[in-house]
């Protein structure tokens, strides 16, 4: 059976530490968020494989079914943690975006006061303004990606809840089938 990989949990913890260290760099944040999205896509694929194995395992034993339900609960808990993390990242990116807009507005005011200065200062300002616009677009794109990721995670949690319901129904049907088999074989009068 597929289980949550400790390496993925360690990776996520290291990733969070890196985000704390590099919060001033929008480019590093974009790279890290791309890695998060890649890892979460891998995790979604792993979850789909895991759900397929659960359907197969239902026919094996009642004990394995109970173990699968427990593992699904752990997986749901971790997905909720990822969802909380993604929500915090979204807020952080939005705050950074607002700060960049404020800086952009301040730079525009500085431009007006320095128009009579040298051409060199004017060229530097234009370069900074272009960079801020570029980063602003990237941050908007990151914010949209995080929103999409949040919706995907909510969909996964709903899928897990549906799978749990199917597990419980299968357990009930297994018990009924066992009772019928015992009655048919004459063990139960």
Swiss-Prot record:
Top-level taxon: Archaea
SUPFAM superfamilies cross-referenced by the UniProt entry: Bacterial hemolysins
Protein name as catalogued: Uncharacterized protein MJ0064
The organism of origin for this protein: Methanocaldococcus jannaschii (strain ATCC 43067 / DSM 2661 / JAL-1 / JCM 10045 / NBRC 100440)
């Amino acid at each position: 059976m597929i289980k949550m990989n400790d390496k993925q949990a360690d990776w996520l913890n290291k990733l969070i530490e890196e985000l704390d260290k590099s919060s001033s760099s929008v480019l590093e944040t974009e790279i890290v968020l791309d890695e998060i999205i890649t890892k979460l896509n891998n995790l979604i694929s792993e979850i789909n494989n895991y759900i397929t194995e659960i359907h197969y395992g239902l026919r094996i034993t009642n004990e394995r079914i109970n173990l699968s339900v427990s593992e699904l609960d752990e997986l749901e808990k971790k997905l909720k943690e990822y969802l909380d993390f993604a929500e915090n990242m979204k807020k952080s990116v939005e705050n950074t975006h607002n700060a960049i807009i404020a800086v952009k507005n301040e730079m525009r005011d500085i431009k007006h006061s320095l128009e009579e200065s040298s051409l060199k200062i004017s060229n530097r300002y234009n370069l900074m303004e272009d960079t801020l616009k570029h980063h602003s677009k990237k941050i908007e794109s990151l914010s949209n990606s995080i929103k999409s990721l949040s919706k995907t995670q909510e969909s996964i949690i709903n899928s897990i809840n549906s799978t749990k319901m199917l597990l419980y129904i299968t357990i009930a049907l297994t018990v009924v089938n066992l009772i019928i088999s015992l009655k048919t074989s004459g063990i139960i009068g």
